[in-house]
């Protein structure tokens, strides 16, 4: 196999089984966002440098992202008093580019009976005339989950620094009449305006083990009435947290996004995403929105399989999208929890980050969504490094030098010329289990091949991101894994391996891998964004300049 160009965005192609050619280009490092993000301190080897992360304390769900007044606004669940969950407020940051963020004062904090015990997740909607409104879940004195509204105090302030709550709060609440579970009624979506002039919003809920998205309607965005039936529900899925419902363009080669209120057109399909509380993963369905019956109808293949597809097959939850009307794209943000122990989080003084914002759109096949880091992240790239073409044989590991191995953006493409030695899968198996059984140290017919990230001298520690190819029912099946089983000598960490199958035919197209590396997070995008896997890792040896980045090909 041969390498031809590493960019950091490390680009290289590999032809497998026999020696192959490849190219790779590398940017030597990704610029650290600002001094308060810097993780160069020996005492903070795991603080990220270019991911969204507060200076200290606990962060979880992204809330109410929107573009207003020339700024991107991001609100988020935050504990101002510590590095564990509790005392939740809506913190607020703004950005011009979705990469460099400036923190502002907290936007929403407990102050009314309807939210006195917490201001939980919700969404922002831009009303006619360009006025933002936030619907969010509050916890009342009885620990009931209710829905509230807040609007800006000063519409002329592009930073939206102050918000006021309605005296009519709560606008939606569980009652004896509606029989809604008061402990399972949260996370309102971005609202959409129907052609009948009514606003609609979804609230996540459940009845026993049936998860559902309860639908409410309003003419004035204040007086809401529950619809006769949920927009959608599914038995055995448990509580639906952080639902998201939005249109996507069919056959969208330009990756264009559309406004949330776009519906009923022939070129539009809809996505229903839910964060399943039982599994702590974000799943989605693709289907159509029946605007007459007010129901979501999953397409063939999604009905029987249920919530099989996921945004990200690693550590990723409570995501939220918004339509960026400035660039006609839909942006996805998600929360990445720690894999360290609570005791270690308290010692660090912080917990949780957000992924790099991703563009999201419908793949041309119509069978799944595609995600890719926003273009703006490329402005952080520095110092390109170019490698001449190299031949790599099976069993070789090549160090990628001249780069900052703990803070990088790597792109690779693999080209396979011979699949005669692929392993056979006799029966279907869960890909995450398969990644655990056949990790980076287990040789196969074709694979594993990919990257070793945060690798220590002697490989006592490393995180592996790799592909492996199988034959299943006379078709080639590509497995993508993020193997954390040897990521740290600290056994208190969660070192679960993750993975998924990638819908790529390796005979007719290259296998691409892009990996964003940032001190304790590894975001990987396979098949040009058709599969995403995020990992949190905390090596004890492979930190700072002791960490190595390697290309590996074991077969």
UniProtKB/Swiss-Prot annotation:
Binding site for substrate: 58-61, 77, 85, 120-121, 186-187, 241, 277
Enzyme class (EC, first level): hydrolase
Keywords: Disulfide bond, Glycoprotein, Glycosidase, Hydrolase, Signal
Gene3D superfamilies, sorted: Exo-inulinase, domain 1, Glycosyl hydrolase domain, family 43
EC number: 3.2.1.26
SMART domains: Glyco_32
One GO process term, biological-process aspect: carbohydrate metabolic process
Stored Pfam families: Glyco_hydro_32C (PF08244), Glyco_hydro_32N (PF00251)
GO molecular function: beta-fructofuranosidase activity
Catalytic residues identified in the record: 61, 140
Reactions catalysed: Hydrolysis of terminal non-reducing beta-D-fructofuranoside residues in beta-D-fructofuranosides
Residues annotated as glycosylated: 154, 181, 337
Domain of life the protein comes from: Eukaryota
Signal peptide from the UniProt entry: 1-22
Disulphide bonds in the chain: 435-481
InterPro entries reported in the protein's UniProt record: ConA-like_dom_sf, Fructan_Metab_Enzymes, Glyco_hydro_32, Glyco_hydro_32_AS, Glyco_hydro_32_C, Glyco_hydro_32_N, Glyco_hydro_beta-prop_sf
Similarity field: Belongs to the glycosyl hydrolase 32 family.
Protein name (record): Beta-fructofuranosidase, cell wall isozyme
Species name: Pisum sativum (Garden pea)
